[in-house]
Amino acid sequence: MYKEASRVLKKGGLLMVGFMNPWIYMYDADIVWDKPDEELFLKFPLPFNSKELEEEGKITINPEYGYEFSHTLETQIRGQLKNGLAMIDFYESCDKRHRLSHYGSDYIATLCIKL
């Protein structure tokens, strides 16, 4: 993705990217969102792939939400840096509607400039 973005951007062009912080995917979403009294525990390895987990019978996907896939921070950030983009800003945000936000940020956004 970043190779193509870099290819079409002119020198000095900006690319803003937002993505989920990968650690969020390590927890069972049902416990995070619907069972606040249950203990949190690590359940899934990264990178997260809900389609594979469904095929293995480990989770059931609600068709209303679709499949989710995560990428490692290295894939996201290094992918930008190794494709002619320089990071000029970085932002994290929390979704206060669930308890994981007490431990870290849910969302990450980067702003890069084409070199």
Predicted regions and their residues:
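Short glycine-/acidic-enriched loop or helix-start segments at secondary-structure transitions
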Residues: M1, M26-D28, R99
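A short glycine-rich, Lys/Arg-flanked "PGG" loop and its adjoining helix->strand segment in the class I
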Residues: M1-L14
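Basic side chains
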Residues: R7-K10, H71, K114
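Glycine-rich loops and low-complexity Gly/Arg-rich segments
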Residues: L14, L40-F44, L111-L115
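A short hydrophobic/small-residue beta-strand
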Residues: L15-M16, M87
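SAM-dependent methyltransferase
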Residues: V17-R78
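C-terminal lobe and adjacent flexible extensions of AdoMet/dcAdoMet transferase-like proteins
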Residues: T75-L115
